[in-house]
């Protein structure tokens, strides 16, 4: 009797675990017009699309430079230490001096304004976006929504937009690019209401594209933008024609189990050439433990650290620069720059300046807290997406997952590329490689839809 009971319990437990690991829940019920603006929804919604120009105004610049000039003396690094304890404050001094003396605010604003900028109100929030239409004839134009992550903005894409909107030999299509600032980032308005998580941002971005007249479109995204885009592909598969991501990630429970099981026989779990990107797991966990302190703070107490970062441009620069450096090359802690040399300093200071002038560091960091606060996020994570997906994995991306794990979430992974260089801010660091992969991925998306069309036609 006892052995039978034990066997029955074991079988039941196994079935329960299997169900949990492989379950595909129903999508959450979402209000697709949920109001995120101040107060209650307005009776008449402003649907206008307004031209917008970026200006680094004199008052902001004067105040910023005064604060930088009056900064306190920083504590020097320990003897023999470069960036192992965080940003090298001697190096930081040179960056701040450059920001005050040599960073050309007008020139940088003019460069950003080479693209048409707009704002429109979506669900109570003014959303900023760049929209560049290609000047072409006899070439198919594919609408492409581009979404960034933290601590970035649509500025991140200023190197790739010109390449994406120009025809290239061997391709019979080009892109119309819509690069949007996530709510609370860059020039997009943040909310004063809790709950604006990546799922809800996905709804906002879908509504933005519909406002612009796109019923169907493609998406390219990284970091938090990739999370929002993945949720869009999951929830709106009839509208998202293809998803290209430079931070591919499956957050399903079975994916975590596979990651752990793969540690037992790494050569069976991942191509031997790339095994050291995730195995041995102790190295991965050591890296994540070393570099994820900011993540935990922002996911729990963003408003507290936000006080210091809002009040001090030196502190804001140090905080953002250190993370941009490590995510561009994690192996250069023994240098003063900590990895920042792989990015153009003016691009980095554009990001810091945009964050400072819009006072949006707190509203951007809150996404870390919101991303884990509501069960609807994990629910959508657990639902597979059948939208054709392309993944590109740069060398120093935060985390790498092999295709056999990615397919837990992305059932139609039509292209997967592994790059032996680059990092998290791909559009800034390796714009040519990213652009090439977007074009090649679009070829696969078009093939996927043509094949499905032939199958449908044969069945009628």
Which residues does each PLM region occupy?
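Glycine-rich "HGGG/HGxG" loop immediately N-terminal to the catalytic nucleophile
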Residues: 105-107, 155, 182-196, 230
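Short, contiguous pre-domain boundary segments
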Residues: 36-50, 71-74
């Amino acid at each position: 009797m006892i052995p039978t009971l034990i066997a029955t319990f074991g079988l039941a437990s196994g079935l329960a675990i299997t169900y949990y690991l492989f379950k595909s829940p129903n999508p959450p019920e979402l209000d697709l017009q949920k109001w995120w603006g101040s107060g209650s929804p307005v009776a008449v919604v402003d649907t206008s699309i307004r031209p917008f120009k970026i200006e680094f105004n004199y008052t902001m610049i004067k105040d910023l430079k005064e604060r930088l000039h009056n900064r306190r003396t920083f504590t020097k690094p320990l003897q023999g230490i470069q960036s192992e304890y965080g940003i090298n404050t001697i190096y930081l001094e040179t960056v701040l001096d450059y920001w005050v003396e040599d960073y050309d605010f007008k020139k940088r604003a003019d460069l950003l304004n080479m693209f048409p900028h707009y704002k429109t109100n979506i669900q109570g929030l003014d959303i900023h976006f760049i929209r560049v239409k290609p000047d072409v004839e006899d070439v198919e134009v594919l609408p492409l929504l581009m979404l960034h992550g933290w601590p970035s903005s649509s500025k991140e894409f200023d190197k790739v937009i010109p390449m994406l909107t120009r025809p290239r030999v061997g391709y019979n299509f080009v892109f119309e690019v819509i690069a949007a600032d996530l709510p609370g980032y860059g020039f997009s308005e943040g909310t004063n209401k809790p709950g604006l998580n990546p799922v809800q941002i996905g709804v906002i971005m879908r509504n933005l594209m519909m406002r612009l007249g796109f019923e169907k479109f493609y998406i390219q995204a990284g970091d938090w933008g990739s999370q929002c885009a993945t949720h869009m592909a999951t929830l709106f598969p009839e509208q998202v024609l293809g998803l290209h991501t430079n931070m591919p990630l499956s957050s399903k429970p079975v994916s975590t189990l596979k990651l752990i099981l793969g540690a037992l026989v790494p050569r069976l779990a991942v191509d031997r050439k790339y095994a050291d990107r995730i195995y041995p797991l102790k190295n991965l966990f050591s890296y994540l433990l070393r570099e994820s302190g900011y993540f935990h703070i922002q996911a729990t107490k963003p408003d507290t650290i936000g006080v210091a970062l809002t009040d001090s441009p030196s502190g804001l620069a140090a905080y953002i620069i250190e993370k941009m450096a490590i995510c561009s090359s994690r192996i250069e802690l023994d240098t003063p720059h900590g990895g920042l040399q792989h990015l153009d300093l003016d691009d980095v200071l554009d990001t810091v300046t945009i964050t400072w002038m819009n006072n949006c560091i707190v509203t951007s960091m809150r996404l870390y807290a919101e991303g884990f606060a509501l069960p609807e996020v994990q629910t959508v994570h657990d639902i597979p997406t059948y939208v054709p997906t392309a993944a590109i994995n740069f060398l120093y991306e935060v985390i790498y997952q092999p295709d056999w794990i990615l397919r837990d979430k992305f059932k139609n992974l039509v292209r997967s590329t592994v790059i032996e260089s680059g990092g998290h801010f791909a559009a800034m660091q390796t714009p040519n490689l990213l652009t090439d992969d977007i074009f090649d991925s679009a070829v696969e998306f078009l093939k996927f839809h043509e094949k499905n069309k032939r199958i449908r036609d044969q069945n009628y």
